[in-house]
Amino acid sequence: MFAMNALTVVSTDLLTPLGAYLRLREDGRASFLLESVEKGRLGRHSFVGAGSRVVNFAEAEACGLPVVGYLGYDHAARLEPKVPLPEDGRGLPESRFVIADTLVRFDHGLGMAEVLCGQPSAVSDLLAGPQPSPAPAEPRAKGGATRRLPSRHEYERAVVRAKEHIRNGDAFQIVLSQRAERPTSASALELYRSLRRVNPSPYLFLLELDGLALVGSSPETLVKAGGRQASLNPIAGTTRPGEGDAERLLGSEKDRAEHVMLVDLGRNDLSRVCRPGTVRLARYLEPERFSHVTHLVSEVVGELEADVSHFDLLRACFPAGTVSGAPKVRAMQLISELERYRRGPYGGAVLYALPGEALDACIAIRTIVLDDGVALLQAGAGIVADSNPAAEHDECLRKLAALETAIELAEARA
């Protein structure tokens, strides 16, 4: 089982998480960088690390060691056998985690870092050494054109079909996504540096996992746990940022109804694994502005039952209602029918787990999957009875805009 190092402190007055990442990734191991920006300020903690073993979700849970990685949306079919899996698409791994041989936790409030895993003196020496250059080794060609799947017409037709299912009583909401694929010359590191500038978010992550990379700026917690306390943050309701955005959201019957529906779904998910009477709302219907959109945000909290593990909590809430719909199982069945391709990492979870201490999982949205020189993007919109097909398509494009801007910026640097 995992036993954390005795507290080993490293001064960070001349060291950033990105600088630490550049040093730790040099030996070719799988590596990760997790940061957070909330309301324009750097979050309290950042995590940087690397490991030589890359495993799937079941192996990550069983190993009893610190792990960082992703669990794809399509894992839902294992949890709910009634949900069919559509065509495979690109054949991406359903899950991929690195077991951390080296793990450093930055505490930006105290201006220090702790070596949680790894030989402390060796890690400290490595972090104190010269910083490798993040620049690419040689000039490369720029990326290619963006291919969108489905087309606008096909997506809007799927929205019409989803509304028919809703009118027939099959579901209250169905989250339909659209994809974009774009060849790119930018590296995962270059994409991350650009994305954290373009779209700073509560969950910033760079995962380089044995030939596959995820670069993301997710605004939304899937679920997190510290000890026996659990929480999740439903986000639903979207408008363009700027003057009057909060009033537009709070005054929109559609956005409020969509949000309330998903808050109720989140409360139900937590109630499956929390002590009776402990699930409550800590925040409710609060407008929050991000770089390219403004959302309504709530927070649901609860206390876990004594026999529930952090991974049990993750399964109980997976996938998030904000990327599936309500009721969740029927919505996922309809997503498989209407989208026709597996989602891969999109709509799943990116997470770290410290056994016996904490788990923090965000929803894998606002995420670039870099696979063999192709950037894969995806975004969705919650379809309800009064949805406008063209408006839902445009909402997806707004959500993709930050990712596409980050790619262009990274390619300009390359």
Briefly describe each language-model feature range.
Residues 1-414:
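Extended alpha-helical targeting/anchoring segments
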